[in-house]
Amino acid sequence: MEILKVSAKSSPNSVAGALAGVLRERGAAEIQAIGAGALNQAVKAVAIARGFVAPSGVDLICIPAFTDIQIDGEERTAIKLIVEPR
């Protein structure tokens, strides 16, 4: 599954475009975010991407989960959003 990493500085429109492209190509995607600002941008991106794929008859579901990732040798807890068609 393709992993899209989102930061608090990410543009929701850019992430939404990437998300819609991955969904059309692979059928599902995972978004990773660390922190409240990044999660905010990620959720906005899912809402925008839903608007991008809706005209083709696709509705999206989003499954939130925790995941542990390594950053500079340090383990951090991130939120992952698994996005799939309904």
UniProtKB/Swiss-Prot annotation:
Cell cycle in keyword set: yes
One Pfam family this sequence matches: SpoVS
Highest taxon listed in the record's lineage: Bacteria
Inducing stimuli: Induced early in sporulation under the control of sigma-H.
Record carries keyword Ion transport: no
Role according to the record: Interferes with sporulation at an early stage. Seems to play a positive role in allowing cells to progress beyond stage V of sporulation.
Name listed for the protein in its UniProt record: Stage V sporulation protein S
Native species: Bacillus subtilis (strain 168)
